[in-house]
C-alpha cells in the first residue's frame, strides 16, 4: 500500500519559466492523488478518443493514408534511379562447375589493381 504521509514531488514551471518543486496532495475523500496545480481543472474536457469521435478518426486515417501514398511515390522514384545497376538478363548458370563436368574457371578480381600487387 502507498505511503501517503510522504508527498510525491515533481518539477513545475511558472509563467516566467522558473522551475520549482511541487508536491502531490492526497485527498482522503478522493480515489486519486491530485497535483496542487490541477485545482479548477474539474471541468476540463480531454480530446475525444478516436473510437468515440468518428470525424476525428476519419481525419487521422485520411492524413495517414495521404502520408503513406507520398512515401510510396518517393520510394518508387528512388528505386527507378537504380534500375540501371540491375542486369537485364539473369545469369542462370550453375555456380558449381565441378558438378557439370566443366573445368573451373578462374574468377576475375573485383579490384584488379589490388590483386596485381602480391605480397612478397
Curated annotation (Swiss-Prot):
PTM: Acetylated.
Keyword annotations from UniProtKB, A to Z: Acetylation, DNA-binding, Host-virus interaction, Inhibition of host innate immune response by virus, Inhibition of host IRF3 by virus, Inhibition of host RLR pathway by virus, Late protein, Viral immunoevasion, Viral release from host cell, Virion
Induction per the UniProt record: Expressed in the late phase of the viral replicative cycle.
Region (Disordered): 1-27, 80-120
N-acetylalanine: residues bearing it: 2
GO biological process terms held by the UniProt record: symbiont-mediated suppression of host cytoplasmic pattern recognition receptor signaling pathway via inhibition of IRF3 activity
Source organism of the structure: African swine fever virus (strain Badajoz 1971 Vero-adapted)
Protein name per the record: Protein p14.5
Function: Structural protein required for transport of intracellular particles from the assembly sites to the plasma membrane. Binds to both ssDNA and dsDNA. Suppressed the activation of the cGAS/STING pathway by interfering with the recruitment of IRF3 to TBK1, which in turn suppresses IRF3 phosphorylation, decreasing interferon production.
Family according to the record: Belongs to the asfivirus structural protein p14.5 family.
GO MF: DNA binding
Recorded superkingdom: Viruses
Residue spans of biased composition, Basic residues class: 103-120
Taxonomic lineage: Viruses, Varidnaviria, Bamfordvirae, Nucleocytoviricota, Pokkesviricetes
This protein's GO CC annotations: virion component
Amino acid at each position: 500500500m502507498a505511503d501517503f504521509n510522504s508527498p510525491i514531488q515533481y518539477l513545475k514551471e511558472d509563467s516566467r519559466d522558473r522551475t520549482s518543486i511541487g508536491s502531490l496532495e492526497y485527498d482522503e475523500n478522493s480515489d486519486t492523488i491530485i497535483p496542487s496545480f490541477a485545482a479548477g481543472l474539474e471541468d476540463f474536457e480531454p480530446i475525444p478518443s478516436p473510437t468515440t469521435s468518428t470525424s476525428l478518426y476519419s481525419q487521422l486515417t485520411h492524413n495517414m493514408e495521404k502520408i503513406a501514398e507520398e512515401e510510396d511515390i518517393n520510394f518508387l522514384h528512388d528505386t527507378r534511379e537504380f534500375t540501371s545497376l540491375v542486369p537485364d538478363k539473369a545469369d542462370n548458370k550453375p555456380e558449381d562447375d565441378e558438378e557439370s563436368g566443366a573445368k573451373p574457371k578462374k574468377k576475375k578480381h573485383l579490384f584488379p589493381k589490388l590483386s596485381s600487387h602480391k605480397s612478397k
